[in-house]
Amino acid sequence: MSTSSVATSDNATLDFSKLVPFSNSSDFHPYCLISDYNNQTNVEQCWLGDQFLPLADLDTENPSIVSTMNNWIQGLVKSYGIDGLRIDTAKHVRKDFWPAFAKAAGVFTMGEVLIGDVGYAAPYTGVFQVMLCKL
């Protein structure tokens, strides 16, 4: 699962009203593609994808977004009896988002941080029970 982005075919014509429950452009970070993977703010607040298929990036600094995400994962886990989550693209969301999200889920969490730098990946070990990274 990825909690940070929503696929779109074209940023210029994106109709946010169709993206339920995040149906306002203010629910997302302003459009910018990630250009510097050494800049954590750029990684967390710019969009994944490319000019042909940009992935709108949720504003996970917004308390309303955080609350909605936490309620959503709690309900999803309960409804489907999920016993563990693999969270892809974890480095694209601020680290302090994840503890409350994992607590709301109430199940085993495995975070994916695709990077070959142990120093960069190490802080995520305190966030998730298991880490996947490229070494």
List the model feature ranges, each with a label:
Residues 5-17, 71-135:
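Active-site-proximal helices and loops of the catalytic beta/alpha 8
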